[in-house]
């Protein structure tokens, strides 16, 4: 099985698979991370392009020829936040790293995170940050991240 990697926008634009199949596979993957309500295909496409204005959603996928089915096995997003400080450079925010339960431990998260880090460097970010649960801090430590400060949040949902 060969896993291929591509941005979600490029994957949609490639027209290799139906938009409905891509939406189903992607939202199915995200549901392994958090609540992911079903949305229309049009809403999915619009949200994909909205996110692309601020960053990149990067996915790993493979196509099962026997089943005639697409599997999106991993995903991560980097959002670029412009700053006045640090000579006007941006911060890269890595978000929504998720690997399909059946494919964890195969290096997919590392491939995705490495790509997002390199993209942040190419975009001249002065740093890249991510939030994670304490139980997976060691994983991101292996990718070169250091624990700095603490994250706080106020949820509206």
Would you name each region that the model predicts?
Residues 1-43:
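Short amphipathic alpha-helix that is part of the acyltransferase structural core
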Residues 71, 82-94, 104:
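A conserved beta-turn-beta hairpin within the catalytic core of GNAT-like acetyltransferases
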Residues 113, 120-132, 146:
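Conserved GNAT acetyl-CoA-binding A-motif
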């Amino acid at each position: 099985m060969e896993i291929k990697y591509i941005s979600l926008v490029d994957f949609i634009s490639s027209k290799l698979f139906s938009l409905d199949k891509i939406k189903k596979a992607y939202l199915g993957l995200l549901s392994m991370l958090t609540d992911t309500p079903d949305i229309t295909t049009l809403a999915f496409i619009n949200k994909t392009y909205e996110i692309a204005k601020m960053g990149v959603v990067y996915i790993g996928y493979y196509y099962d020829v026997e089943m005639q089915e697409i599997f999106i096995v991993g995903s991560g997003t980097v959002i670029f936040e412009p700053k006045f400080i640090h000579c006007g450079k941006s911060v890269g925010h890595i978000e929504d790293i998720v690997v399909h339960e059946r494919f964890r431990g195969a290096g997919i998260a590392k491939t995705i995170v490495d790509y997002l880090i390199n993209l942040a460097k190419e975009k001249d970010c002065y740093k890249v940050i991510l939030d994670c649960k304490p139980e997976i801090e060691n994983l991101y430590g292996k990718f070169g991240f250091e624990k700095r400060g603490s994250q706080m949040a106020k949820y509206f949902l």
